UniProtKB/Swiss-Prot annotation:
The active site is at 64 (proton donor). GO terms for cellular component: cytoplasm; nucleus. The keyword tRNA-binding does not apply. This is Cytosine deaminase. Keywords: Cytoplasm, Hydrolase, Metal-binding, Nucleus, Zinc. It comes from Saccharomyces cerevisiae (strain ATCC 204508 / S288c). Its EC number is 3.5.4.1. One of its GO terms (biological process) is pyrimidine-containing compound salvage.
């Protein structure tokens, strides 16, 4: 796992979009976790999204899942040259989606407020994981957890 810095020319763009999505979700009254899927070849944004569990009464619309949903239908081969950006370490469900679609690279904004087993599992399956330790991501997530601990525990299945 790479920690601390941006490694690709699209990483800052991807993390900025993911954070914008997290902030939008928070403003809507949801969990502030955002994501973005970027094509590694040309930097095009294939999809972006944020956690919509509270807004839509959904059990599964985490930030990463919402991002993939907003990509629409893509050929399987498209995912093979992408990076998924997420503001928070992916949970088991989101890790499974990353593996299922063969997304080779995942850039994580922060893993202080939630440290899942997903990062390590992705690595064992051959996926690159980069944790950039983004202060914006840490701050908005901590603020949400402090304000709404029960909603946070519900979101992570506790």
């Amino acid at each position: 796992m790479v920690t601390g810095g941006m490694a690709s020319k699209w990483d800052q763009k991807g993390m900025d979009i993911a954070y914008e999505e997290a902030a939008l979700g928070y403003k809507e009254g949801g969990v502030p976790i955002g994501g973005c899927l970027i094509n590694n070849k040309d930097g095009s944004v294939l999809g972006r999204g944020h956690n919509m569990r509270f807004q839509k009464g959904s059990a599964t619309l985490h930030g990463e899942i919402s991002t993939l949903e907003n990509c629409g239908r893509l050929e399987g081969k498209v995912y093979k040259d992408t990076t998924l950006y997420t503001t928070l370490s992916p949970c088991d469900m989101c890790t499974g989606a990353i593996i299922m679609y063969g997304i080779p690279r995942c850039v994580v904004g922060e893993n202080v407020n939630f440290k899942s087993k997903g990062e390590k599992y992705l690595q064992t399956r051959g996926h690159e994981v980069v944790v950039v330790d983004d202060e914006r991501c840490k701050k908005i997530m901590k603020q949400f957890i402090d304000e709404r601990p029960q909603d946070w525990f519900e979101d992570i299945g506790e």
